[in-house]
Amino acid sequence: MADSLVHSLASSSQLEAFDSFEYAEELCTLGSEWIQEAGVLLNLTQNCVIVCLILFRRYCTLYPPRVPDLDAIVMACVSIGSKTTETPASVQDICNVVVYLKERFKDTNFEARGFIAHDLYSEEMYSSRNRLSNMELEVLRALNFDTHIVIPHKLAIHYLQTLQLIDNKKLLQITWNFLNDASRTRLCVLYPPFSLACGCIAMAARVIGMKLPKDWYRVFDTTKEEIDSLTSILENFYKTSAIAHKTLYLIFTEQVSA
C-alpha cells in the first residue's frame, strides 16, 4: 500500500511489554473515554478526536500509563491532536475539561458538588498548564515527532463507494460506530488503517445480515485472518469494558493499589 495509507504501528515486542504492566489496558480504555468526551465538550472535529485517540494509544503502548499521569497524557494528546488537525482548542479549556472529567470519574457525588473551572491565573491552572506542556514534549519525543495519522473512517467510505454500498445508510452508520470504538482500542496500533476499515465493514455487514462479495477485502490488501482477529478483539472490548470501568474506579479511589 502507499505510504499515505499507513502510519506507525506497534511491534509485537512493544505489545508484549505493554501487557506486562498491571492495569495498562484498563487505563488506556479510560483515557480514550476521556478523550472522546473532551472532544464533545471542546467541540473538536471527529477527525481531530480520532487523531488524539491514536496518538494517545501509540504513546501509551510505548510507555504504559500510571494513574497519576493519565490526565496529563490525555491533555497532551488532545493538545497535539488539535494542533495537528488545526482545530481550535485553548490550553486553558483543555486543562479544565480534563480536570473536570477526572474529578467526575473519581467522585460519585460530583454532580451534586459541582465543578468550578480554574481561572487562567490560578495556581491550579498554572500547575495544569505546566504538566500539559511537559507531557506534550515527552509524548512528541517518544513518537520521534511523528504525528502522521491516517483516519480509517475515510478509507471505509472509499471502500464502501468502491463496493457500491455507500447508499446503505445503516451499513455506513454501523461501520462508522465500529471504527469509533476501534480507535479506543489497541486495534489502531495493531493493524494498518486499511485493514481496520475492512474489519469494521465486515462486522457491520454481519450485524445487519448483509452478504458481501467473496474475498472483497483482498482488493484492499486485507486478509480473512486479519478480519477475524479484528472482530475478536473488538467483541472482547465490548464484553470487558464495563468490568474495566469498575476496576478503574477502585484504582482511582485507592481501594486497589496501582
Swiss-Prot record:
Keyword Cytoplasm: yes
Subcellular location: Cytoplasm; Nucleus
Any Pfam family: Cyclin_N
Major location (coarse): cytoplasm
Residue ranges occupied by any Cyclin N-terminal domain in the UniProt entry: 16-148
Signal peptide bounds: none
GO cellular component: cyclin-dependent protein kinase holoenzyme complex; cytoplasm; nucleus
Alphabetical list of CDD domains matching this protein: CYCLIN_CCNL_rpt2
One Gene Ontology MF term: cyclin-dependent protein serine/threonine kinase regulator activity
One biological process term in Gene Ontology: positive regulation of transcription by RNA polymerase II
Record keywords, A-Z: Cyclin, Cytoplasm, Nucleus
Family named by the database record: Belongs to the cyclin family. Cyclin L subfamily.
PANTHER family documented for this protein: CYCLIN
Name recorded for this polypeptide: Uncharacterized cyclin-L1-like protein C1296.05c
Organism of provenance: Schizosaccharomyces pombe (strain 972 / ATCC 24843) (Fission yeast)
